[in-house]
Amino acid sequence: MEHCFGCLKDNVRGFCSSCERKLFNRSKINPQLKFNWEDISKVIEGYPAGFSISGVQTKGFIGKATGTELSPTLSEGDKSIYIIKPLLSRFNLPSDSPANEHVTMQMAKQIFGIRTAECCFMKFANGTPAYVTRRFDYNKNEEKLNQEDFASILQAKKDTSGKYKYQAKTYEDFGDILSPLNKVEFIRILIFNFLTGNGDAHLKNFSLLETQDGDMQLSPCYDLMNTKLHVNDSPIALNLFRELERTSLPRGQFYSYSINDFIELGNRFKIRDGLLKKIVIEFTGADQKMKIMIGKSFLSDVAKEKYLETIDRNYRQLFLS
């Protein structure tokens, strides 16, 4: 069965009308690109070497849709409306990384209603997979919006080796910055990241974005993926609490998270008990929906099986331990 390259809707060749509108301003774009990775303007993310995947992630910038195609080059003055990522060549299951990020972003958005950047799965001219996302730091008039990541907001310092001192910053520290509404959203994102095996949600993977009213709110999610498919990653990127529950353990021991830890973080954020209970119920019964979407994804059969194992393992740990 064919699925939409954007939302994975059944019986769709290419993109459904809804994804054409959200991603390409109603243009009928071919998911088979006419260019290759080598043809694109690109940068290597300037993350410290200590990052598991982001430290070597390369992003390309492509322009507006022209007819039925995306443009691989930007003329002077043009804006890079889309970001494109190739496969991760240096990790396990490299060809699955674009489909991994794509399906993880879709699960966050469709199953849990988490705000995410609009994204899709595509293929380069040579057939290799690509992940494409529409930038959210431009408004409808293509005017640049202010965006600042939490490495900057929390003023994370680098040590002499160039690595961020992650032990000095925790997810609890985000509560000093986030609005009450954003704190609820943030808890839901953290639970989702744990369940999907995202051990790479560092300070730079969260941002505040300027709204139409000029204030700064938590941006849509980006860079969501199951990092366990590609590296032997930690369960979460940062400690939940300022007590440093993860990194304070003796070497070789691992902190076993349960849903009560996330509830405790919610309590410290002063989120109402009834709302926290509602969040727990929402996630408790969603594993089957996640498995169905993984089954429809563009992942290889091997990657699908490993992703399903991640979901089963983390659901057991979070809700049954």
Segments predicted by a language model, with ranges:
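Anionic ligand-binding catalytic core segments
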Residues: 1-203, 207-321
